[in-house]
Amino acid sequence: MNVPSMMHLATAMNDSEPAPSERPSERWCVLLLSSRASRIFCGDRERLVEVGDIHDDVHRRHSQGGWSQARFQRGIEKEIEDHIKRTCELLFARFQDEPFDHLILGGPSELSHRVEHDLHTDLCQRLVGHVDIDVERASVEEVHRRALPVIEAQERQREQDALARLTEGIAPDGHAVTGLDEVLELLSEQRVETLLLAQGFVAPGLSCPRCGRLSTTGTSCPMDAAELQPQENIVDHAVERALSQSIEVLIFREHRSELERHGSIAALLRY
């Protein structure tokens, strides 16, 4: 059996913080796997990049009968099992180096349950769907095209779940707030668990050059009396603040209009 080869990422997927104009996007991984070949793609909803491939020498079936065929077939199954296990181990190693949020499997559906059996628990928890695709011949554009419906379905579900929590949370004594002023205030208090944003939402605001407090009104910071500085888009600064506090940021695309009714920005609170 050949030693699998792994390509390294050729584009800039690094750990640097996003520029203020960039909005966070969930990281996706697509694993294509056949009985003898595997390919790994990583990226986001807009673009995937092939980052690894694995090829193992798995013998093909033959038509001879008797004990010889049985032994040969058992050998093939063992080689396939080793290939799947090796692929899952390498995928998990990559995940540890460059984590992603969701995983999609692609290839023959009959291998899916075998792959799931060998996936690390952390990867199983991120598995959201399967696509039928030619593992060895598919272009990166086709992989993205097949994966996109799964990605969009996952986004719709997460947005629906967040909206349900928001609706429940904005009741009296609930754990959610809506509107830019309220959200910025709760960000300053570090009480936000999830920041919800309508795609494309921008708004002007103010920031404190000393403590970083964000607001939409005032001339001086209520915390340290520093003169507030105007910001063309305070929403980007809110996103940066959220990421610095390890807050989940969810961009609404499919249900954007529903969040726009709440001022295009909301927050689910820790307490």
Task: Name each model-derived stretch.
Residues M1-Y271:
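Terminal alpha-helical anchor/extension segments at protein ends
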